[in-house]
Amino acid sequence: MDLDLLDLNPRIIAAIKKAKLKSVKEVLHFSGPDLKRLTNLSSPEVWHLLRTASLHLRGSSILTALQLHQQKERFPTQHQRLSLGCPVLDALLRGGLPLDGITELAGRSSAGKTQLALQLCLAVQFPRQHGGLEAGAVYICTEDAFPHKRLQQLMAQQPRLRTDVPGELLQKLRFGSQIFIEHVADVDTLLECVNKKVPVLLSRGMARLVVIDSVAAPFRCEFDSQASAPRARHLQSLGATLRELSSAFQSPVLCINQVTEAMEEQGAAHGPLGFWDERVSPALGITWANQLLVRLLADRLREEEAALGCPARTLRVLSAPHLPPSSCSYTISAEGVRGTPGTQSH
């Protein structure tokens, strides 16, 4: 019994045992007034008991935040990431997607959001030493049909994309049988899916990645500008459920989002082109933004801008508690999504 290890007056220890409290942790489950009533100890004695119990569980060492960060082996899940399948993109995100929390990937049409989501569905199936989680993925479609042909192409091209993985291991992986696809058409069906179907797959260890493509589509279809309150409630419910699932099963959640565009006239003082400049921002507003851990933006330039020599596609870190605002360019080929070396900027 660890109660005997506490540096307390034997009379206090006896009072604790008489109250049928069996451990230090059990003592800390009660408030001061409750302990006073259970043990018949005085207020100073109860305060001393709680302080001693707290110090006993905490231990004597005091660690700084830097020391905690450096001792990764003591907190493995806090530092583990899901690789994106590309060393350049992983470097941008310091290893990949965090396991606990929602990552949003917003961007224009044809920016490559779905391509990256499919690549993650394959990456999650690799062993941990190769950046995966040794499990499958749940892919929830809310807009278009699932891109089966593109997935088959990516599966066939894995040996060319993942040159870091031995060929015999690639041959053993059965990528297609580890991706569980759901199609939902409205908000209620989406909420039912994440509340009932997704937890079953996660709890059985069949999946460790949840993808929603896209989160904005059902909300934009069902709720107009006059229905902001019910939309906010449903967004909060969805976000809370996804965060709870991610935390409980240490499974990253990737939500693809649409963007809104604001037009600004760009003159000579603002740039060399003299046309209307589009400023994009993720859809769904502040209610949804508050549910997120990481917010990424996949940006695809227009032909006029790309003609000036700018990178055609850029992945930006808009916000994250562990990442600075940064970006890198990337390309999409038959093999998948690759970051361009030497293009990362802060």
From Swiss-Prot:
Protein source organism: Homo sapiens (Human)
Q: Name one GO cellular component term.
A: nucleus
Which disease annotation does the entry carry?
Answer: Breast cancer: A common malignancy originating from breast epithelial tissue. Breast neoplasms can be distinguished by their histologic pattern. Invasive ductal carcinoma is by far the most common type. Breast cancer is etiologically and genetically heterogeneous. Important genetic factors have been indicated by familial occurrence and bilateral involvement. Mutations at more than one locus can be involved in different families or even in the same case.
- Any Pfam family from its record, for instance, is Rad51
The impact of changing T241M is: In CMM6; likely benign; no effect on function in double-strand break repair via homologous recombination; able to complement DNA repair defects when expressed in XRCC3-deficients cells
Q: Which UniProt keywords apply?
A: Acetylation, ATP-binding, Cytoplasm, DNA damage, DNA recombination, DNA repair, DNA-binding, Mitochondrion, Nucleotide-binding, Nucleus
Q: Name one GO biological process term.
A: interstrand cross-link repair
User: Which GO molecular function entries does the Swiss-Prot or TrEMBL record give?
Assistant: ATP binding; ATP-dependent DNA damage sensor activity; DNA binding
**What's the name of its gene?**
XRCC3
Name listed for the protein in its UniProt record: DNA repair protein XRCC3
What top-level branch of life does the organism fall under?
A: Eukaryota
